[in-house]
């Protein structure tokens, strides 16, 4: 019998392979691959665009993979299409590349009220599960991304990581550079030794909450459109991706 591999092991391996440089806007990021019916592609990209423009995606950069093409070890079947989109663990990889120790802790559902994040309502730690927590919560239909976009209040997917509080200034510089590069997915940066969105952090640590990369997929699911997402799929050079507003469908 094969040993179980908790999702944290895969996350840490992929973090180490991230080469993205926000200042140069070059390098490899971690992407999720979504498989959809080709006939739904135009509508799905429209929904993804809504999520991006509402600040509910990791990055506006995407790539469409056509039927018959292959990305990583995923081959797109006839009458299907693939969409590669940024995974939030890319943020951890960029922090790590900058020499900042970072430990992804958990994924969950965050309650938003009038545009402000209140608290995590449901969480799963990365070292306690063999599958991505955000996939679990999306499959249980616990999100209300549509309501969030329409009203400013709702429940979205997010995750949290810890870093040493002594690295705070450097963390803020790196996060600012990511925002300038289009990765405007930082939900909240906590104070040292203080809870973040109701979740306790370790001693001499600070928490960083980031919007989950699967919120656009949750929006599609809420609209009763079939979508099969494979989180933490591969690393992809960002220069192979284009802004969602420039995608040719």
Model region roles, listed by residue range:
Residues 1-13, 22-249:
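Conserved mixed alpha/beta catalytic, RNA-binding, or beta-rich assembly cores of soluble enzyme
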């Amino acid at each position: 019998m094969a040993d179980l591999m908790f999702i944290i092991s895969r996350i840490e391996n992929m973090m180490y392979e991230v080469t993205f440089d926000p200042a140069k806007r070059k390098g490899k990021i971690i992407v999720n691959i979504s498989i959809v019916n080709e006939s739904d592609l135009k509508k799905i990209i429209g929904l993804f665009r809504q999520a991006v423009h509402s600040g509910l995606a990791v990055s506006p950069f995407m790539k469409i993979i056509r039927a018959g093409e292959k990305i990583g070890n995923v081959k797109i079947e006839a009458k299907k299409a693939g969409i590669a989109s940024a995974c939030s663990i890319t943020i951890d990889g960029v922090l790590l590349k900058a020499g900042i120790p970072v430990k992804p802790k958990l994924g969950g559902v965050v309650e938003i009220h009038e545009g402000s994040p209140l608290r995590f309502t449901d969480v799963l730690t990365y070292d306690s599960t063999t599958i991505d927590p955000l996939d679990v919560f999306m499959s249980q239909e616990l999100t209300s991304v549509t309501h969030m976009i329409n009203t400013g209040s709702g429940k979205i997917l997010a995750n949290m990581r810890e870093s040493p509080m002594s690295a705070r200034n450097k963390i803020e510089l790196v996060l600012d550079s990511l925002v300038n590069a289009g990765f405007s997915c930082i939900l909240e940066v906590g104070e040292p030794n203080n809870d973040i969105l109701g979740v306790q952090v370790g001693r001499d640590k600070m928490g960083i909450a980031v919007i989950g990369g699967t919120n656009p997929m949750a929006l599609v699911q809420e609209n009763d459109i079939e979508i099969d997402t494979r989180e933490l799929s591969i690393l992809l050079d960002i220069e192979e991706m284009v802004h969602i507003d420039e995608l040719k469908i």
